[in-house]
Design a protein with these regions (language model features):
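N-terminal glycine-rich anion-binding loops that anchor highly charged ligand groups
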Residues: 41-59
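Catalytic or ion-translocation cores adjacent to nucleophile or general acid/base/metal-coordination motifs
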Residues: 115-131, 190-231
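A conserved active-site cap/scaffold subdomain adjacent to cofactor or substrate pockets
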Residues: 207-314
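Active-site glycine-rich loop that binds ribose-phosphate moieties when present
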Residues: 157-171
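Gly-rich Lys/Arg/Thr-decorated short loops/hinges at beta-loop-alpha junctions or inter-strand turns
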Residues: 8-15, 53-68, 87, 131-154
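C-terminal non-catalytic interaction/assembly regions of soluble proteins
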Residues: 2, 312-471
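N-terminal amphipathic/basic leader segments beginning at the initiator methionine
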Residues: 2-34
């Protein structure tokens, strides 16, 4: 069945629900959101935002180890509860859960649809964010030098932040599901709004308003009270049944934020303002691939229980450059932990750290934390811990870590921590160790014209592309 192009709507509301704010979010979140979208009726989109910078780095590592991996590992669990209902109700799904392998994610969704006995959905994959290949090598090297990166840096991968245009084009071409890799988080919302309302691509004010709606949605339950909660200071009811956010976007881009009825959490001026300012370095110039948003005259107004309206956002022309995240190998991270309890537990944990420093002295700096004494507020050199007198903590967990270019050298830490079982000091237990490759991240800017975003449809049989377009 060929894709059915969508017709832009100039009036009414577009409801966009968010069912994930990061990779590893709750997999039962989408159900109540889809229930609410179906009950409300009208055009609706379900987004999953699962791709932080570190998440993409981990996905790149996964694909290097296994060419079939590299997309969101929880993808089947996220979609299985709602895929059939979304397709039946005409709710489009848009997500960056493609990570380092969007085509692999599309094939995974087709496999899930077959498992559920569904007709093959029309899945579009957005590509163009990967700028690590030969075509971009010279431009990327120039951009890295301009950013002050180490001249010896060897990129493992490089991904540009794409905007909303290819998402909008895919939806207009009839996609039921749009799978992206690296796109700007708000663009997951801007794309559907751009396609639905038929805005011009230089309608900066409307694009800015939709961008801020997407910004409110992108972290999931941060805006419905999750990350906001601080008992006795900022109380939030029902954290165990936290509702995920829904934005009702009108034809001018203004939005009302809410959540499904009967779910936990809260949506009010406080939660919305906190998320509105999240990661916003300059409120007058929030840079995205789609627009530069200005919230200096924005108004946040409570219009009812768990309903907040955002207005007054303005926009300016989008930047001429796109941000690029470049990942490069930085060696191996080795970690080890062991617990000490009872009388003189802290003294024994400190002695264990001293033993490890002596045994691993030739490998470089060793970080040692005493969880329960000094860890989050400790420093890599251990000066803060050393400055504290040995106390009487009776429940202490020692954590040590080091980074080394050589895997075998880093692995020595894991063996030395395990050896503390019998080599002392007394009473150590609960050893846990880990060894994993580590990627560093450098950001730079590429001229927009050097990054070509496009989409193509991925048929269920894996045959040739059914349709293709460039943004």
């Amino acid at each position: 069945m060929p894709p059915t192009p969508a017709t832009p709507q100039r009036h009414g509301l577009l409801r966009v629900g968010c069912a994930a704010g990061f990779s590893g979010d709750r997999t039962d979140a989408a159900g109540p959101v889809v229930d609410a979208l179906i009950a409300a009726g009208g055009p609706a989109v379900l987004i999953f935002e699962t791709l932080a910078e570190r998440t993409l780095a981990l996905a790149q590592l996964a694909r290097h180890a296994d060419p079939d991996a590299g997309y969101e590992p929880l993808l089947p669990e996220l979609l299985r509860p709602v895929l059939a209902r979304c397709l039946a109700a005409g709710i489009r799904i848009v997500s960056n859960f493609g990570a380092a392998h969007p085509a692999g994610a599309a094939r995974c969704i087709h496999a899930l649809a077959r498992e559920l006995g569904l007709a093959p959905p029309r899945i579009a994959v957005v590509s163009g964010d990967d700028v690590s290949g030969p075509a971009h090598r010279a431009a990327l090297a120039t951009a890295l030098r301009a950013a002050g990166a180490d001249a010896d840096l060897q990129p493992v991968s490089a991904n540009a932040y794409l905007g909303a245009e290819a998402i909008a084009d895919a939806l207009r071409a009839g996609a039921e599901i749009v799978v992206c890799g690296r796109v700007a988080d708000p663009s997951l919302t801007v794309g559907p709004a751009l396609a639905h309302f038929g805005w011009a691509r230089d309608d900066w004010h409307r694009l800015a308003r939709a961008t801020m709606a997407g910004h409110l949605l992108e972290c999931g339950t941060q805006v419905t009270g999750g990350y906001y909660a601080d008992p006795g200071f900022k109380d939030v009811p029902g954290l165990a049944t936290l509702g995920y956010p829904i934005a009702e976007i009108d034809a001018d881009g203004h939005c009302t934020l809410t959540k499904p009825a009967g779910t936990g959490g809260r949506v009010d001026a406080h939660t919305v303002k906190e998320q509105l300012l999240y990661e916003l370095h300059d409120p007058a110039a929030y840079l995205t691939p789609d627009v530069v948003a200005d919230i200096t005259e924005a108004e946040v107004c409570e219009t009812g229980p768990d309903r907040v309206r955002l207005t007054g956002v303005r926009g300016q022309a989008r930047p001429d450059t796109l941000k690029v995240n470049v990942f490069h190998a930085t060696g191996w991270l080795a970690e080890g932990e062991i617990s000490y309890a009872g009388a003189r537990a802290e003294a024994r944990a400190r002695l264990a750290a001293d033993v490890l420093r002596e045994r691993l002295a030739g490998l470089g700096p060793l970080r040692a934390d005493l969880i329960g004494v000094a860890s989050l507020f400790n420093d890599d050199a251990g000066q803060r811990l050393a400055a504290l007198p040995t106390g009487e903590a009776r429940d202490v967990r020692l954590r040590v870590a080091l980074n080394h270019a050589d895997r075998a050298a880093a692995e020595r830490l894991t063996r030395e921590v395990t050896a503390l079982y019998c080599c002392g000091p007394a009473g150590g237990g609960g050893v846990r160790t880990a060894l994993r490759p580590r990627l560093g991240t450098v950001s730079c800017l590429l001229p927009r014209e050097q990054v070509q975003a496009r989409f193509h449809f991925v048929p269920a049989d894996g045959a040739a592309q059914a349709a293709e377009g460039a943004a």
